[in-house]
Amino acid sequence: KEVKQGDQISLPNDPSNEGRALQLLAQNKLITLKKGVASPTIRDITSNKLNLKFTELDAAQTARSLNDVAVAVVNNDIAAAANLKPANAIAVEKITSQSKPWVNFIAAKSSKDKNNATYKKIVKAYQTKRTAELLKKVYKGSTLPAWNYKF
């Protein structure tokens, strides 16, 4: 599918996900954003050559909005629940240094626990090829094992 002049696009309306959605649109050259803004909003769009129209919705509603808009930017967990597959997407977020804020991680309550042997075993048990395969299967490619990336 190609994005056309004047198409309506639904975006998540919470600050983190809206910024991430706009960055995805910018990565795909549909809009240009003001430089240096970590969590952009639609007010930070500096160029919109296709005159795209934006509808901000609760993130949980973006997949359902596909019946009413040309394009929706949908978070991976919501996409998986709606049976949307990354292979059918017109764009998928690229893993870059900008992705770091959205990486899930295993954390200890205190930095003094950083070297706790039990916690290290949990991390080792989680960061396996089998877990990576399960992530791919369950999330149909929309969630990736972050331990394979250097940020």
Where are these regions (language model features)?
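A bilobed periplasmic-binding-protein/Venus flytrap-type ligand-binding module shared by bacterial periplasmic
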Residues: 1, 102-118
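A conserved helix-loop-strand patch within extracytoplasmic ligand-binding domains
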Residues: 1-31
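Alpha-to-beta junction loops
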Residues: 7, 30, 50-53, 67-74
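Solvent-exposed loop/turn segments at secondary-structure junctions
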Residues: 15-18, 60-62, 77-80, 112-113
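Periplasmic-binding protein-like
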Residues: 20-26, 125-147
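Short helix-initiation/N-cap motifs at beta->coil->alpha
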Residues: 37-64
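A ligand-binding cleft/hinge motif common to bilobed small-molecule-binding domains
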Residues: 62-89
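Short amphipathic alpha-helical coupling segments at ligand-binding clamshell hinges
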Residues: 114-125, 134
